[in-house]
Amino acid sequence: MNVTTTRFGEIAVEEAKIITLPDGMLGFSEKRFVLLTPQNITPFCWLQSVENPELAFVVVDTKECASDYAVKLTAEESEKLCVNDGDEVVLLAVVTMASDPFNITVNLQGPIALNPKRMLAKQIVLEGSRYTTKHPFFDQAARSKAPGKRNASGEVTAA
């Protein structure tokens, strides 16, 4: 099937690669998406709607930004995702990009749980968790090792 996108033009997508979010993303009615992985933005991917050319989210595997991050699916969530014992569930976080890479944030309070075996996903809202919608992608240690100097507002300037 061909998918029209505003970012990548028309692309060919195998039906088997389409991810269904039965409940959609929060605030959006679209339910069918595909993960696009342009080589120039590793480790980030695009979660592109196959129904709306303009709707796409930058996402990242939560392992890339929070090594201790874990989510316990409820029985209802597991059922919606058709997760059986031993099935892999990939957790993706929606990314907010910034002109200064050290200001990139990820939404760890509303991860997307993906069952890659069934190509089913669900955005989950973690209530009462320590995670936020604006978790820094880079930790403080990475920021302090970055070349250049930081001004009072935290922006990097030439060394």
Curated annotation (Swiss-Prot):
Lineage, highest ranks first: Bacteria, Pseudomonadati, Thermodesulfobacteriota, Desulfuromonadia, Geobacterales
Superkingdom of origin organism: Bacteria
Keywords recorded for this protein, A-Z: Bacterial flagellum biogenesis, Chaperone, Cytoplasm, Translation regulation
Chief place of localization: cytoplasm
Gene (name only): fliW
Stored Pfam families: FliW
Localization per record: Cytoplasm
Tagged with keyword Cytoplasm: yes
SUPFAM superfamilies, sorted: BH3618-like
Residues that span the membrane, as ranges: none
GO CC terms: cytoplasm
Described function: Acts as an anti-CsrA protein, binds CsrA and prevents it from repressing translation of its target genes, one of which is flagellin. Binds to flagellin and participates in the assembly of the flagellum.
UniProt GO BP: bacterial-type flagellum assembly; regulation of translation
Subunit structure: Interacts with translational regulator CsrA and flagellin(s).
Signal peptide: none
Family, similarity comment: Belongs to the FliW family.
Protein name, as recorded: Flagellar assembly factor FliW
